[in-house]
């Protein structure tokens, strides 16, 4: 009797386990399908960069994702043509993105520290006023921003792309809210020991907010790297362009938006 009961329980275990984990299985399958859907454009772009121009033009005929004939001619063209100095663009993009990220981390963390920890008159009103003004779309400030860069004689130079992006009210808001979880007792103890505001910021606040600073750094770097509109306006010399508007120049150098040759070469530049 006992042996029969144990055997029956063992046989029922897989079914019971399946019922208990049905929700997790469905969620896993849904996320797997979602991941495939999100990855397909990336896979298609990378694979298409190895296609010939003729095959790219005949995509609707073959409907193939992987190339019929693999070739690296698109990468050879991107690296060899004088009209598209892609290594210079990549260098400019790294300079702009890294410089902007460092400045964003310093300015937003110190601003958040001041708004959250220091006491001064009208700080809440100032913060929420600036936060409200940030709700306007960025395109509203393009003309004043252009005039300011022109007055500083920074147009067509990398500083004109670096400095307009070093502020970010959302990042200040993010760091400030994270700072609320850091006990103020640490500040008070350091203050009793004779530490000033800058020492408290450097030795206590910064080590405590490393997780949110990592997030802000990722936002700042990817935002600067992917920026297209403002670098296209501020930079006119092809050698001074960053990578994103440079890819547009690659399309123009290929003679417009028609055909498939320039498409696969743009994809090669994008993959690089």
Regions found by a protein language model. Give the residues of each.
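N-terminal acidic, proline/glycine-rich, low-complexity intrinsically disordered segments
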Residues: 1-5
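A structural signal for multi-pass alpha-helical bundles of membrane permease subunits
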Residues: 6-8, 15-16, 23-272
């Amino acid at each position: 009797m006992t042996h029969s009961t144990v055997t029956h329980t063992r046989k029922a275990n897989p079914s019971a386990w399946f019922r208990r984990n049905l929700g997790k299985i469905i969620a896993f399958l849904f996320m797997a399908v979602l991941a495939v859907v999100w990855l397909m454009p990336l896979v298609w772009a990378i694979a298409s960069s190895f296609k010939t121009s003729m095959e790219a033009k005949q995509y609707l005929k073959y409907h193939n994702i992987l190339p019929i004939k693999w070739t690296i001619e698109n990468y050879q063209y991107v690296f060899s043509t004088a009209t598209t100095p892609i290594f210079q663009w990549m260098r400019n993009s790294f300079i702009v993105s890294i410089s902007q990220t460092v400045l964003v981390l310093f300015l937003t963390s110190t601003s958040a520290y001041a708004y959250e920890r220091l006491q001064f008159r009208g700080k809440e009103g100032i913060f929420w006023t600036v936060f409200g003004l940030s709700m306007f779309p960025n395109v509203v400030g393009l003309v004043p921003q252009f005039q300011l860069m022109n007055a500083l004689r920074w147009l067509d130079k990398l500083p004109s792309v670096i400095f307009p992006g070093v502020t970010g009210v959302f990042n200040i808001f993010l760091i400030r809210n994270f700072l609320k979880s850091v006990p103020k007792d640490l500040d008070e103890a350091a203050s009793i020991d004779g530490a000033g505001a800058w020492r408290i910021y450097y030795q206590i606040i910064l080590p405590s907010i490393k997780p949110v600073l990592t997030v802000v750094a990722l936002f700042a770097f990817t935002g600067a790297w992917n920026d297209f509109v403002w670098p296209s306006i501020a930079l006119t010399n092809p050698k001074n362009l960053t990578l994103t508007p440079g890819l547009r120049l690659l399309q123009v150098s290929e003679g417009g938006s028609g055909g498939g040759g320039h498409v696969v070469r743009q994809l090669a530049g994008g993959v690089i």
